[in-house]
C-alpha cells in the first residue's frame, strides 16, 4: 500500500457536488409566496445532513427540531410546541460547537421572529395560505406587475406590436426599460431550475426595436377633472399617461427644458439614447397630456405656488424625484475641480459636457450613478479614471455588468479606500485625494461595514473629483406648503395619498429615496389608480391583447442568449449606444425558453390572467 496517495473525488462526492449545483439553482429560482415554515424545515434538514455528529446540540438537537417542525407542517403541533421549538433553537444556537449547528439554530430563531404568524396558521388551521397565493415570479417581482409571460409568448409568435401594447398596460416606458431596467423579473425565473434565467430585458428590447409605430390606446370620455403633476420624470409621466386614458386632463409642471427626469438627465446616451427615450415620451404625450416646461413650483420669485395648484386642480401628484447630490463632509470638498456626478450628467444631458482631456479623475461612490459618471469621464477624454469605494467591489450597489464594463473600458476600482480629505494648490484647485485604507468589518444592516485598517493614509494625485455618494430631494418648498416629510422624503401612504392633505398624492424617488426606474413607474401607476378613485371614478386600464395559449414543448436545456456589446476600444471613444440588440434567431430561441409559468405550476393563474387594473 502506498504511503501517500493523490486525493481524488469519489463518484459519490461527484454526485453530491452535482446535487449541490442543482440545489443552488433551485434556491436562486425560489419564487415569492413559498411557505416559509416549509422552507425552514427543508433547510434544517440540509443543516442536519451536514453535521459531523461530534456535538450533541447539532447531532441530536437538530433532529429534535426537525421532528417538531414536521409536526407543525402536519397539523399535529400546539402553541406549546412553538414555545419548545424556540427554546430548543436557542439552546442549539448557544451551545453548538461550530457554525453548522449554531447557524441552524439562528435560522430557526430568525424564522420565528420574521413569520411567527405563519407557524401559528399551521398550528391553528392546519395549513398555510401561501401555496394558494403563490404568484408567477417574474410578474410578482416586477414592481409594475408587467405580464412578462404574456409578452414573451407574443414575441415568440412574432406579434411585436401586441407585445408592446401588453407591456404598456402596466409600463409606458417600454423602450427605456428595455435598455436600462435592472430587470428584477429575472432574479427568480423558474428557468433557473433547468439552466439559466430567460433574458427578459433583451426580449423586451427586441419587441421595442421591431414593433413599428404603436399608437397609444384611445382615452375615455373627458371627465372634466384636472390633475396637476409636479415633475416630468418617469413617475409623473406614467401617472399622466394612465390618468389621461381615464379621461382626466393632466398638466405636467417640469422645471427643466426636457421631460424624462433622471432618464434624460442622469443616464448617459451610451446606455439610453435620447431619441429612444423620446419614443416613450411622445407616446405618453400623444394621449393629450399638457406640459408646462421651465416651470418651478415653490414660493420664490417667478415660481408657481403649491397653494395655487391646489386651488386650480382637482388633484395634485408630486413626483419631483431626487436631483440634488449629497456631500462628502471632508476638508477640501468645495475646491475647484470637485463636481457632483448629478450635475456632471445633467450638463452632458443639456449638451454642455465638461472637458476632461488629459485629466486624472477620481469618482467617489459605488452605485449606478458612480458607474455612469466613470464611464462618461472616460468618454470625455480623461487620462485615468479611478473609482474610490470604502467597501469591497462585491459590496457595490451598482449592477455588476456596469462595474465590469467600467473596468473593461479602463477604469480602476480602488476598493476599501475612504476619502479623508482633498488637497488643493494655492489657486484652490484639486491636486490630490487623501484616502484612508479600510478593512472589511462587522456586518450591519445586511452589508459588512468598513473599519480602520491601521495603515497610513495614502495620497492619490488627481485633477478632478466626482462625488457620487447619493442623491437628495429638494423638499423644503413643499414642506413650507404643509407637505409632511421626514429626512427630506415626503410621507405618503400606501395608496400614494398624503395624510390630511385632501387631493394631494406623492410618489417615486421623492417618497422612497433614489430607486430604480421601474419603481418610479410603478409609483406613477399606483398613484393614477388611486387618484382616479379619489376623483369619484373606477376606470379600468386594459390592453385588449389576447395572449396565445402555450404549446406543449419539450423544454430541453439551452443556454441563455447574452446581449453583445460594441468593441471596448471603439465604444469608449463616443457616447453611441454600447449594447447591441438580439438577432431574429436569438430572440426566437430565447422566447421559446420561457416555461410559461402563467399556465404551468402556479394555481393563481388558473382561470385567467390579470387583464385590467
Predicted regions and their residues:
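A conserved FAD-binding loop/helix module that cradles the flavin
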Residues: 510-541
